[in-house]
Amino acid sequence: MSHIPSELKYATSHEWIRVEANGEAVVGITEHAQDLLGDMVFVDLPEVGKQIGAGDDCAVAESVKAASDIYSPVSGEIVAINEELEGSPELVNSDPYGAGWLFRIKLDDAGELANLLDAEGYQNLVDEE
C-alpha cells in the first residue's frame, strides 16, 4: 500500500502539491503513480517562467514501462524545477514526496486548492483503481 502524506493535497491524475507560506507550492507525482510507472529513466520538466493552467500537461515522466504526462494541479507560473532529476530521475522513485519533487509554482489562485483531494480522498481514489 502506498504512503499518502496527510499534509499534502492531491489531483485525481496522481500529482501532489505542498503549499508553502510564501504563496508558492511544490509539485510531484505520488508514490502510487511512480509504482505504476516503474523505474524512471528521464523526466522532462517545464520551463521556468512558463504560465500554466490547472489541469494542463506540463511535464513528462519516462520510465522503463511508459511515458506519462504530468499535469499541474493548479494554475500559476513555474518558478523553479528540480534540476537534480536531470542526472538522477530515479529520485522520483526513491523519494517521491521529498528529493523527487518536480517543480515549484507560484499560485495564481489559492482557491483552486479546494478542487483537490485530501489524503483520505486520494486513498479512496487509489483503492477504487
Swiss-Prot record:
InterPro entries named among the record's database cross-references: 2-oxoA_DH_lipoyl-BS, Biotin_lipoyl, GCV_H, GCV_H/Fam206, GCV_H_sub, Single_hybrid_motif
Swiss-Prot/TrEMBL keywords: Lipoyl
GO cellular component, one term: cytosol
Pfam families, per the entry: GCV_H
Keyword ATP-binding appears in the UniProt entry: no
Domain Lipoyl-binding residues, every copy: 24-106
Cofactor details (free text): Binds 1 lipoyl cofactor covalently.
One GO term (biological process): glycine decarboxylation via glycine cleavage system
Modification sites for N6-lipoyllysine: 65
CDD domains on file: GCS_H
PANTHER family per the UniProt record, alphabetical: GLYCINE CLEAVAGE SYSTEM H PROTEIN (PTHR11715), GLYCINE CLEAVAGE SYSTEM H PROTEIN-RELATED (PTHR11715:SF3)
Complexes and interactors: The glycine cleavage system is composed of four proteins: P, T, L and H.
The protein, known as: Glycine cleavage system H protein
Protein species of origin: Aeromonas salmonicida (strain A449)
Lineage: Bacteria, Pseudomonadati, Pseudomonadota, Gammaproteobacteria, Aeromonadales
Name of the gene encoding the protein in the UniProt record: gcvH
